Regions:
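Active-site catalytic loop in hydrolytic enzyme cores
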Residues: 62, 91-165, 170-171, 175-181, ...
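CN hydrolase (nitrilase-like) catalytic-core segments centered on the catalytic cysteine
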Residues: 62, 67-85, 150-232, 340-363
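Short beta-strand scaffold segments in enzyme catalytic cores
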Residues: 86-88, 99-102, 133, 196, ...
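Active-site beta-strand/loop signature of hydrolases that rely on acidic residues for catalysis
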Residues: 20, 28-58, 77, 84-85, ...
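Residue-level recognition of beta-strand->loop/alpha-helix junctions
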Residues: 9-11, 42, 113, 198, ...
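Conserved small-residue-rich
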Residues: 24, 39, 270-342, 348-359, ...
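C-terminal beta-strand edge segments of enzyme domains
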Residues: 133-136, 193, 199-284, 309, ...
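Beta-strand-turn-beta hairpins that frame and shape the catalytic cleft
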Residues: 1-5, 134-143, 166, 278-287
């Protein structure tokens, strides 16, 4: 199945619902006239975003079932025979949510409540309390994630695992680099379309940068409206099979530690209850990252030594180097065998000595050859005379 998708962009005026509804109605009609079947509107599309108080938010919020904005969108979807996704402040009678709705010619299909709040949300909205949903429609399986939700991989990943083919994202995005690399990453890593509808303009001193766009399952921007009012439109091809060769298959068995992680808890309380040794004092230190592209092992080793020496002279205490920096990126198995480094290679002793001289810890990537002759893409923390394998990805 193929059809046109569209991302609507306009300057949303704060607390002026009538003006905003008129603007979005005009642009939705334009998009539908150009053949769009799935049209995405910005986050908080009729109200503006930076509410000063709960009172302001309450004044603008609507019930999903019979609110002014939803009624208008239902009428448009029915008249224009299209599907609309739009963000709005929702009132359920007791609480307020930053929500988005999916509406089709048949009426309201479903909603999503924003799970990851940005600063303005915290003044009025309750965090989304419903699980991720994917909605089956005549134009495919549609997921919804609102703005900041896209900054976290879990929501888009769950949407894809539940069958989403298109992820619609109403935005109030103010990052200057647009379309954001985050949008492209979510499309690429999940192999699904992302339609991101952002607003433009200034609200209370905060600039919204526009750049609404459509990203295909390969992570390519196939439509973008950089500035001002307008529409980004592109073909949605549900039969498109993205090339997954660059992204290895998921390996959930390696992610189990996430279920046992303790980071959300107060560290002092955790250590008081479970630690066998005192909690280390926090320290500030200087760190550095270094970009390089060595063509072979010798060139890579020289570049690494120079980077360590420079970091030491600058007083850095941690240096992070690129993946596969020792040897470069192999084109095939034969080349990987040539650049692979054994676990007992003298290079580790030399690197350990060098980092000890310069008082800097180093993290770097390489291809390692195990004793069983299998090769792995690994990363290593080199600290004094001690090297620790941090991660590995088998390629045997």
């Amino acid at each position: 199945m193929k059809y046109k998708g569209a991302a609507i962009q306009y300057d949303c005026h704060f607390m002026d619902k009538e003006k905003n509804l008129a603007a979005l109605t005009n642009l939705v009609r334009q998009a539908a006239a150009q053949g769009a079947k799935l049209i995405v509107l910005p986050e908080m599309c009729a109200t503006g975003y930076y509410f000063d108080s709960m009172e302001q938010a309450t004044e603008m919020a609507e019930p999903i079932a019979n609110g002014q904005t939803v009624r208008l969108l239902e009428n448009l979807a029915k008249e224009l025979d299209c599907y609309l996704v739009a963000g709005l402040p929702e009132s359920d009678g007791e609480r307020l949510y930053n929500s988005a709705v999916l509406i089709g010619p048949e009426g309201l299909i479903g909603r999503h409540r924003k799970m990851h709040h940005y600063v303005p949300d915290s003044t009025w909205a309750k965090t989304g309390d419903e699980p991720v949903k994917v909605f089956n429609t005549p134009i495919g399986n549609i997921g919804i994630q609102i703005c900041m939700d896209l900054s976290y991989p879990e929501g888009p990943r769950l949407s894809r695992l539940m069958g989403a083919q298109v992820l619609c994202s109403p935005m109030n995005w103010n990052e200057p680099s647009i379309p954001s690399s985050i949008w492209l990453t979510r499309a690429k890593e999940n192999g699904m379309y992302v339609i991101a509808s952002n607003r433009h303009g200034n609200e209370k001193g905060f600039d919204f940068c526009g750049g609404s766009g459509i990203i295909d399952p390969e992570g390519r921007v196939v439509a973008c409206h950089p500035y001002g009012d307008g529409i980004a439109m592109a073909e949605i091809d549900l039969e498109m099979k993205p090339d997954r060769s660059e992204i290895p298959l998921r390996r959930p068995k390696l992610y189990r530690e996430l279920q046992l992680q303790r980071y959300p808890w107060y560290q002092s309380q955790y250590y008081q209850a479970y630690a066998t040794e005192p909690l280390l004092e926090g320290k500030q230190f200087s760190t550095a990252v270094c970009s390089m592209k060595p063509e072979n092992r010798e060139e890579g080793f020289m570049a690494v030594k120079q980077a360590i020496s420079q970091a030491g002279k600058q007083g850095e205490r941690l240096l992070v180097l690129p993946e596969l920096v020792l040897g470069g990126v192999p084109d095939d198995l034969q080349q990987a065998q040539c650049v692979a480094i054994r676990e007992d290679d003298p290079v580790w002793k030399e690197l350990s000595s060098l980092v000890m001289e310069n008082h800097v810890d180093v993290i770097l990537g390489f291809v390692i050859r195990r004793k069983r002759e299998a090769m792995e893409c690994s990363s290593m923390l080199v600290r004094g005379w001690f090297s620790t394998l941090l991660s590995e990805e088998s390629s045997d």
